[in-house]
Regions:
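Extended, low-hydrophobicity, polar/charged segments
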Residues: 1-184
Length: 184
């Protein structure tokens, strides 16, 4: 798969979804510089590996989680190579019985479909229904990769821009968590 890294938004946004264009508008309004890769839908690990290599940054695994009653929701950003075990996270955030949230909540709260979950979706969560959780290892990388609310493009953002500009503008104060690394 041959991928070409481009700086900023596409020159021609025709044929792109409104939620993708909103992502570029939001980043541009914050003065955040970014690089973009357009690609086929990132649904397999092979595609994700090629994207990771081309972006040259950490692609986050983003999970939408909820408690058993579906009254508390969490978006977890973690390195793609880490294994997620609910027990490792539950105690840190004081929520038992975490599970993966139904895709309908992604669409309802974030205007994102499964496979496209991204920190940029939080710009659509005006009621702050989702608590942002970030594994500490994500913050060790100089760059963070994410989707512009659609999984046919990936962005590389400077970690400092994410921490100092993007997260404050999203109005979602993150909780930093420590997820263990398991041996394969």
């Amino acid at each position: 798969m041959q991928l070409q890294l481009q700086h900023g938004r596409p020159a021609d946004c025709s044929g792109r979804l409104e939620k993708e264009i909103r992502s570029y508008d939001f980043l541009d309004s914050l003065g955040i510089s970014y690089y973009r890769l357009d690609h086929e839908p990132a649904m397999t690990m092979e595609i994700c590996a090629a994207i990771d290599e081309s972006l040259g940054g950490l692609i986050c695994k983003n999970l939408l989680l909820c408690n058993r009653q579906c009254t508390s929701f969490y978006m977890l950003m973690m390195p793609g190579d880490k294994v997620f075990k609910t027990k490792d996270l539950s105690a840190q955030i004081g929520s038992s019985r975490l599970s993966f949230a139904d895709g309908k909540y992604m669409e309802e709260f974030l205007d994102i479909t499964p496979g496209s979950l991204s920190i940029l979706g939080l710009m659509n969560d005006k009621e702050n229904r989702i608590q942002l959780l970030i594994d500490e290892d994500v913050l060790k990388s100089p760059f963070i990769g994410c989707h512009p609310c659609i999984n046919t493009s990936s962005l590389r953002l400077d970690k400092e821009d994410v921490v100092q500009k993007l997260i404050p503008a999203l109005n979602h104060e993150p909780i930093i968590v420590q997820l263990p690394t398991y041996e394969a």
